[in-house]
């Protein structure tokens, strides 16, 4: 059937058909059709959604997400035909029954996913099957290679090419803003692609965006890295391993992070940007993704094994993740804290130590320093101002202000100090509670929102002294953040009353 094309501004791949047209074509809700643009003869597939009112008879409405592959224009004539069920469905059902994917089956699934042949429910079924029944190392390798092949890849003539990654879960993780310039200043290449915050108070891409643009193509990333030695960019703006981004999108509502998918996701991005050397930070402890050291070692061995299969040398650092890195959480607060350290000012010990430790491992792996001297060399690069100079070079090549200073980042004018209710030592902080408070205050959307942690575990505080200060750009945001702080007890001081429980009599 030939119809006239209309469009709707949503990203979900879908085609809306009037119920009368759908009956004539012979499709039901959730079925898929092929869409051919008559002018170019280009054909794609998309899942069907049926409506009586949103699309009139004789018209088909596709989402912008669908049109990314069709490249049509509103008013074009298109041909719609019922499409057969893709082979991927049988492979997904096989995994549901406990089977194992072959390389060819994985390739078909990723191809169908990338070209929007699979519907959202079918992608969700794939993710759920892989989560419940798991992926062995062969399947993880297949998945990694196919995710890389689904998009653009970068190749550098100069070697080695370094990358770093953190498993996440720790607030205030701004170390990329120090690690990347240290590594680049040593003469190595580091094309760092980063993510935005999904559930956190600020992803690395959010932080870097306060300093410079972060959306670039793969070709631009290569050129900038070769000129400046490194970049810090948003991976979501590229066409690098796009199948991975799609899977993550469907994982998020389920709040699941399948182990095999996580391994493939990490390594696909590294492989696609041409990295041959990678340092991976695995934070452990309460509130992190990895509960203890034993589990951290298991994950590290899996990442190293996968790296060996892919030709990437991987070393992992199992680190303490029980409290924030540094004392600031929120975009401007974290950027200011990181730049302050690069400028040679005194900073939080946790931020300095972790940054030079991760950078130092990379320097040792690449032969820039001898064994056990990498951290010292990394600290020396910071102390001598080489890392600051390199960071300003990176900021400039990405389109930012090379004269920027740590004092150039304002915080929200609405503030609230959370005081200690008693004297004593801070026994713990709740990472997730701090993240929730910062997000309630407006971070990462409001760059001036967030919090400053005055006291960390092991430090003494007197009654009435500040535990943390909350910053917000809007009054109502501050009110929400205060409510979150009062109910979550983000900083625990020994002897403090957490709850009073009375009888009903």
Curated annotation (Swiss-Prot):
EC number: 2.4.2.57
InterPro entries listed in its UniProt record: AMP_phosphorylase, Glycosyl_Trfase_fam3, Glycosyl_Trfase_fam3_N_dom, Glycosyl_Trfase_fam3_N_dom_sf, Nuc_phospho_transferase, PYNP-like_C_sf, PYNP_C, Pyrmidine_PPase_CS
Example GO molecular function: 1,4-alpha-oligoglucan phosphorylase activity
Keyword Transferase: yes
Active site per the UniProt annotation: 257
Catalysed reactions listed for this entry: AMP + phosphate = alpha-D-ribose 1,5-bisphosphate + adenine; CMP + phosphate = cytosine + alpha-D-ribose 1,5-bisphosphate; UMP + phosphate = alpha-D-ribose 1,5-bisphosphate + uracil
UniProt KW keywords: Glycosyltransferase, Transferase
Residues the entry annotates as binding AMP: 169, 195-200, 204, 265, 289
Single GO biological process annotation from the record: pyrimidine nucleobase metabolic process
Name of the top EC class for this enzyme: transferase
Entries under SUPFAM superfamilies matching the protein: Nucleoside phosphorylase/phosphoribosyltransferase catalytic domain, Nucleoside phosphorylase/phosphoribosyltransferase N-terminal domain, Pyrimidine nucleoside phosphorylase C-terminal domain
GO cellular component: cytosol
NCBIfam families: AMP_phos, ARCH_P_rylase, PRK04350.1
Purpose of the protein: Catalyzes the conversion of AMP and phosphate to adenine and ribose 1,5-bisphosphate (R15P). Exhibits phosphorylase activity toward CMP and UMP in addition to AMP. Functions in an archaeal AMP degradation pathway, together with R15P isomerase and RubisCO.
Family the UniProt entry places it in: Belongs to the thymidine/pyrimidine-nucleoside phosphorylase family. Type 2 subfamily.
PANTHER family, sorted: THYMIDINE PHOSPHORYLASE (PTHR10515:SF0)
Protein name per the record: AMP phosphorylase
């Amino acid at each position: 059937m030939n119809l006239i094309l209309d469009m709707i501004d949503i990203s979900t791949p879908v085609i809306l058909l009037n119920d009368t047209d759908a009956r004539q074509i012979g499709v039901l809700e959730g079925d898929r059709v092929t869409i051919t643009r008559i002018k170019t003869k280009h054909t794609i597939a998309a899942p069907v959604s049926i409506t009586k009112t949103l699309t009139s008879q004789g018209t088909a409405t596709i989402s912008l997400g669908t049109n990314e592959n069709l490249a049509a224009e509103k008013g074009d004539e298109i041909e719609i035909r019922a499409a057969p069920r893709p082979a991927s469905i049988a492979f997904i059902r096989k995994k549901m029954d406990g089977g194992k994917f072959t390389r060819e089956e994985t390739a078909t699934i990723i191809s169908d996913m990338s070209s929007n042949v699979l519907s959202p429910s079918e992608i969700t079924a794939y993710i759920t099957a892989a989560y419940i029944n798991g992926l062995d190392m062969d399947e993880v390798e297949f998945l990694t290679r196919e995710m890389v092949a689904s998009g653009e890849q970068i190749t550098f003539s100069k070697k080695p090419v370094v990358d770093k990654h953190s498993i996440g879960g720790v607030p205030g993780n701004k170390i990329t803003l120090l690690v990347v310039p240290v590594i680049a200043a040593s003469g190595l290449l580091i094309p760092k692609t980063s993510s935005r915050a999904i559930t956190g108070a600020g992803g690395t891409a959010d932080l870097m965006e306060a300093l410079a643009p972060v959306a670039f193509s793969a070709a631009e990333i290569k050129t900038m890295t070769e000129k400046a030695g490194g970049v810090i960019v948003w991976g979501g703006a590229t066409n690098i391993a796009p199948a991975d981004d799609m899977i993550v999108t469907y994982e998020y509502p389920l709040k699941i992070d399948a182990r095999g998918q996580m391994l493939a996701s990490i390594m696909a991005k590294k492989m696609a940007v041409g990295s041959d050397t990678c340092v991976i930070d695995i934070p452990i402890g309460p509130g992190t993704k990895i509960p203890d050291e034993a589990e951290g070692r298991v994950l590290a061995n899996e990442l190293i094994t996968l790296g060996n299969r892919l030709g990437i040398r991987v070393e992992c650092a199992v680190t303490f993740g029980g409290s924030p890195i540094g004392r600031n959480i929120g975009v401007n607060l974290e950027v200011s804290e990181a730049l302050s350290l690069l400028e040679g000012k005194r900073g939080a010990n946790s931020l300095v130590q972790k940054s030079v430790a991760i950078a130092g491992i990379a320097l040792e792996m690449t032969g820039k320093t001898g064994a056990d001297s990498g951290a010292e060399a990394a600290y020396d690069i910071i102390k001598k101002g080489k890392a600051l100079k390199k960071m300003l070079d990176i900021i400039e090549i990405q389109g930012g202000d090379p004269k920027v200073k740590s004092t150039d980042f304002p915080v929200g004018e609405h503030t609230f100090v959370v005081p200690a209710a008693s004297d004593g030592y801070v026994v713990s902080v709740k990472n997730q509670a701090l993240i929730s408070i910062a997000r309630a205050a407006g971070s990462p959307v409001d760059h001036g929102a967030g919090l400053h942690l005055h006291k960390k575990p092991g430090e003494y505080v007197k009654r009435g002294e500040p535990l943390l200060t909350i910053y917000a750009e809007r009054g109502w945001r501050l009110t929400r953040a205060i409510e979150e702080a009062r109910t979550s007890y983000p900083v625990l001081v020994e002897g403090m009353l957490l709850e009073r429980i009375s009888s009903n009599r």
